[in-house]
């Protein structure tokens, strides 16, 4: 089960992009990867055609493994730091909660 969803703020915990943070653009659970805004940038040489208006060297985000990402705690004394996630039942619905501060992670998405 993925604990990271689209729109979450995450921080990279290992690799060349360590300590960089950004918002998740897309999650691919089958491949266990995610696209994070501003993290793991690559350069691609691209020709101009009907689908791509720009030509030349394009910089874009590359997928990064989910095991290298951790959710950022939105509140509490550890605001902005990595946290683990636990699930609680609230009104017969599963809610994601930050382990460090105990704040709900899905509350601001509605």
UniProtKB/Swiss-Prot annotation:
Keywords: Ribonucleoprotein, Ribosomal protein, RNA-binding, rRNA-binding. GO terms for biological process: translation. It comes from the Bacteria. GO terms for molecular function: rRNA binding; structural constituent of ribosome. The keyword RNA-binding applies. One of two assembly initiator proteins, it binds directly to the 5'-end of the 23S rRNA, where it nucleates assembly of the 50S subunit. This is Large ribosomal subunit protein uL24. It comes from Ureaplasma urealyticum serovar 10 (strain ATCC 33699 / Western). The gene is rplX.
